[in-house]
């Protein structure tokens, strides 16, 4: 599989950052509601977070990659007594997250360039954020996530269900997406010593994504 050049991938990531700076409130209200034009079912997050939290000890450390404005996922994680670090590269999203989820810590960073201590966290979550990262950077990120996790730690993420790359207007801003197939993601995870435990298709309107849980070996 061939990927775009470094400069092109940087341009694509910048497009996503500017896009979420522009559409932050349209994408997710302070009440946690999704945009009316979106097929996303925000109520699903509660169940996903509950499944992850049920695997962790009280007070476990969780990194929420691409946390956005912190709602609902970061807030749900923190509300279950977990120590949460939210990561997002949109300044607008992050400022809202700091206000809306004071129980969590936040850092403004591009997940593709994030540095964390090895074996410093019990779980990593990435809900609808990896799909905005160029595929070459997604693949390179999985071994780093494994490095951040303690042995036996968990990675829960929404990834693509089928291969697709594109840029299109979204809620009034240009946005970029990059999806591999579910099978490709499972291969990448396995190669990074993140053993897939299960994956589920999440239908959304006429399409959908895949939710996958993996465990650090």
Where do the protein language model's features map onto the residues?
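Conserved class I S-adenosyl-L-methionine
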Residues: 2-57, 163
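Short, glycine-/aromatic-enriched active-site segment of Class I SAM-dependent methyltransferases
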Residues: 160-176
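Class I SAM-dependent methyltransferase SAM/SAH-binding core
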Residues: 61-113
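A conserved beta-strand element that flanks and buttresses the S-adenosyl-L-methionine
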Residues: 125-126
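Short alpha-helix
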Residues: 177-193
């Amino acid at each position: 599989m061939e990927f775009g050049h470094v400069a092109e991938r940087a341009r694509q990531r910048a497009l996503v950052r500017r896009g979420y700076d522009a559409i932050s409130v349209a994408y997710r209200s302070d009440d946690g509601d999704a945009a009316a034009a979106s097929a996303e079912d925000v109520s699903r997050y509660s169940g996903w977070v509950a499944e992850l939290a049920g695997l962790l000890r009280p007070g476990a450390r969780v990194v929420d990659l691409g946390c956005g404005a912190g709602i609902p996922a970061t807030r749900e994680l923190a509300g279950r007594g977990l120590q949460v670090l939210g990561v997002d590269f949109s300044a607008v999203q992050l400022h809202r997250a700091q206000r809306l989820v004071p129980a969590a810590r936040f850092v403004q960073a591009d997940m593709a360039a994030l540095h964390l201590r090895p074996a410093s966290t019990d779980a990593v979550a990435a809900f609808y954020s990896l799909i905005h990262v160029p595929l070459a950077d997604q693949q390179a990120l999985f071994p780093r996530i494994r490095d951040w996790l303690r042995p036996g730690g968990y990675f829960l993420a929404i990834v693509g269900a089928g291969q697709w790359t594109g840029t299109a207007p979204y809620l009034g801003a240009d946005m970029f997406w990059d999806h591999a197939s579910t099978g490709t993601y499972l291969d990448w995870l396995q190669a990074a010593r993140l053993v897939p435990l299960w994956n589920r298709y999440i239908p959304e309107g006429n399409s959908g994504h895949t939710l996958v849980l993996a465990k650090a070996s």
